[in-house]
Amino acid sequence: MDQSTLKYYSDNAAQVAERYESVVSDLSAHFADAFSKGGKILDVGCGSGRDLADLHKLGFDCYGVDPVLKFVEIAQRLHPELENRIALGKLPDLQVPFNGNFDGVLCSAVLMHIDIEQLPATATAIKSCLKVGGRLLYSVPSKRTDVVGSNRDANGRLFIPDQAVRLNSLFSSIGFTEIASWTNSDSMGRDSVEWMSVLLELQTA
């Protein structure tokens, strides 16, 4: 994952977590339909633990990883029900956590921070976490007008445009099939941002 992006999240973890916790993710409305009931789910880039806590409330056997130690600490403090269910881990060099064999992987607002050349390794790492028939639900921006020519916002975070197009082609090449995709507005109410969400299923090992 991009180092400048990681530094921003580490330096501003408390403020970012507060923003995350103040809104409900539009993606959470799809969790129950996207993943098998009671399935083992991994949230990659779980941040404040908001989505992970929602998965837990829905009865999923859920776990999370995040590359920012402060986020791991904040998530476990805000959501004590997630104790021993969150660990450090980052893409693309993610080691399969919590004994793997997941029924689902969630990557909400994460994959746009991955350099294009790291996408193949990222896709392989995600695939290695899933069992055949498992599903991946991810979201990336379909619009972000505050990102300039360098593909970075004012805070220095990397936002690769059109990432969904690359990702869908890449995941298709390693055994995934698209189940559904949709666009939605920004849960934080930012007019400059819209999201593309994609649900994929792993068909072959």
Where are these regions (language model features)?
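Class I (Rossmann-like) S-adenosyl-L-methionine-dependent methyltransferase catalytic domain
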Residues: 1-38, 42, 47-98, 114-121, ...
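Short catalytic micro-motifs in class I SAM-dependent methyltransferases
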Residues: 109-113
